Amino acid sequence: MVLSAADKSNVKAAWGKVGSNAGAYGAEALERMFLSFPTTKTYFPHFDLSHGSAQVKGHGEKVAAALTKAVGHLDDLPGTLSDLSDLHAHKLRVDPVNFKLLSHSLLVTLACHHPSDFTPAVHASLDKFLANVSTVLTSKYR
């Protein structure tokens, strides 16, 4: 799915409002995913998955950092996320459906924290962006 100029603008503006909360939102999205889709917990058997756990917060920071990097390189997501794609495909072997579940959880988290900014157009742009990120992260599974 190609991001239009309007999509890119919406994604950059929305992520810009996330700012210093990115790590916290990443952790919240992970917690939301674990609660809503319990099967996703199987990829984190060594984590303390309780609310506010340091491990979930740390992984939320990693997720947020990767997305922040991706937002900064919207025209080269494959190059930007290549290492993460390798990691998830070859070492972690995460089922690709889980990226969609995390994307959904992140969209809900962003909508909860920024309801007035989460217009239908912004929602659609963020959804396309996260779908593109998911596609890149699963590209090396083939």
Swiss-Prot record:
Q: Name one GO biological process term.
A: hydrogen peroxide catabolic process
Coiled-coil boundaries: none
Any one GO MF annotation of this record: organic acid binding
Protein residues bound to heme b:
88
Q: Does the keyword Transferase apply?
A: no
Give the keywords, sorted.
Answer: Heme, Iron, Metal-binding, Oxygen transport, Transport
Every copy of the Globin domain together lies at 2-142
Q: Which residues cross the membrane?
A: none
User: What InterPro entries does this protein map onto?
Assistant: Globin, Globin-like_sf, Globin/Proto, Hemoglobin_a-typ, Hemoglobin_oxygen_transport, Hemoglobin_pi
What is the similarity comment for this entry?
Belongs to the globin family.
So what does this one do? Involved in oxygen transport from the lung to the various peripheral tissues.
Q: How does it assemble?
A: Heterotetramer of two alpha chains and two beta chains.
User: What is this protein called in UniProt?
Assistant: Hemoglobin subunit alpha-2
Organism annotation: Capra hircus (Goat)
